[in-house]
């Protein structure tokens, strides 16, 4: 019995073949097959999020018998999967999302990619998918971006979205850890996440009959099942005239996340302190990369209290009655920072005075982050592709 490095033990004897079991793939073994026909690049001003893809993709196959195969950059193509693949039946899969930016100096930067690799690794363990060397995967991703670098928009309002994905591919209807898997990476040039544009406020629909995640579940992992199961509530939010779902949890209606974003409240708290608050990472909150950066920035500024704490709808409505709420905004890789203007809760529309207050803090955070992403400000939060 041998530990296959995927969070539990499994038979990994290599019977039936003489190949050595490979514990991780290596970027130095990368096989590159360039596309012979390159597609026309889109206008960066007319990009619809996630609908256009670049010329190439990265794939790495794994099996419990032989371990990792060599990584391969190849022309973008459809996958060939057995219809019994575990990802198709039992959602044995995960994904990540990060971006490459073309800076004002024409250099291409990745923003905090190590945090994405860390989160992807944790999600793989939770999904019983094989683990990998995070630095090797990141190097392979960098090589993919370099090959498709002309797809990184020449624009400071667009970027190249990077979508690593990891799926179980074993052809079996048994509910079990897969013995075969495929890791692949897609690239997509993107503009603003919301059709309303960058930094326009969104309205939220809060209904406690739906929950996004629960204690002991997978809400802190970036798994497709967390998103697919949210679509019904999202459709209901739209039917009620709102753009996103404000996910509540528990009998006290704790505020957790907004759609695909983490949530921040900038207010005067119960003790009369100026505070930036966001829900804690207790297992039901996705540990967002942008969330982490916002907390780090706020701590560096040292101008107000910064807290990871529980917030309820009663806390919010009481604060609004006392004119103690300044701003509410979501954060995420796709949107960066997104102001909140209204919440539909218990049949009533609650107005959040985010835009009336500037929003000074949300605007400041957005400006700081985008300055770093587009190279207007040097920072160790980015990796410059050489």
UniProtKB/Swiss-Prot annotation:
Highest taxon above the source species: Eukaryota
Gene3D superfamilies reported for this sequence: 3.30.470.10, D-amino Acid Aminotransferase, subunit A, domain 2
GO CC annotation: cytoplasm; cytosol; mitochondrion
Gene Ontology biological-process entries: branched-chain amino acid biosynthetic process; branched-chain amino acid catabolic process; G1/S transition of mitotic cell cycle; L-leucine biosynthetic process; L-valine biosynthetic process; lipid metabolic process
Modified residues (N6-(pyridoxal phosphate)lysine): 222
Stated regulation of activity: The branched-chain-amino-acid aminotransferase, activity is inhibited by anticonvulsant drug gabapentin.
EC number: 2.6.1.42
Modification type N-acetylmethionine: residues: 1
Keywords in alphabetical order: Acetylation, Amino-acid biosynthesis, Aminotransferase, Branched-chain amino acid biosynthesis, Cytoplasm, Lipid metabolism, Pyridoxal phosphate, Transferase
GO MF terms held by the record: branched-chain-amino-acid transaminase activity; L-isoleucine-2-oxoglutarate transaminase activity; L-leucine-2-oxoglutarate transaminase activity; L-valine-2-oxoglutarate transaminase activity
Record's catalysed reaction(s): L-leucine + 2-oxoglutarate = 4-methyl-2-oxopentanoate + L-glutamate; L-isoleucine + 2-oxoglutarate = (S)-3-methyl-2-oxopentanoate + L-glutamate; L-valine + 2-oxoglutarate = 3-methyl-2-oxobutanoate + L-glutamate
One Pfam entry name: Aminotran_4
SUPFAM superfamilies: D-aminoacid aminotransferase-like PLP-dependent enzymes
Co-factor requirement: pyridoxal 5'-phosphate
Subcellular location: Cytoplasm
Tissue: During embryogenesis, expressed in the brain and kidney. Overexpressed in MYC-induced tumors such as Burkitt's lymphoma.
EC top class, as a word: transferase
Complex formation: Homodimer.
Family (UniProt): Belongs to the class-IV pyridoxal-phosphate-dependent aminotransferase family.
Entry function: Catalyzes the first reaction in the catabolism of the essential branched chain amino acids leucine, isoleucine, and valine.
This protein's name: Branched-chain-amino-acid aminotransferase, cytosolic
Species annotation: Homo sapiens (Human)
Gene from which the chain derives: BCAT1
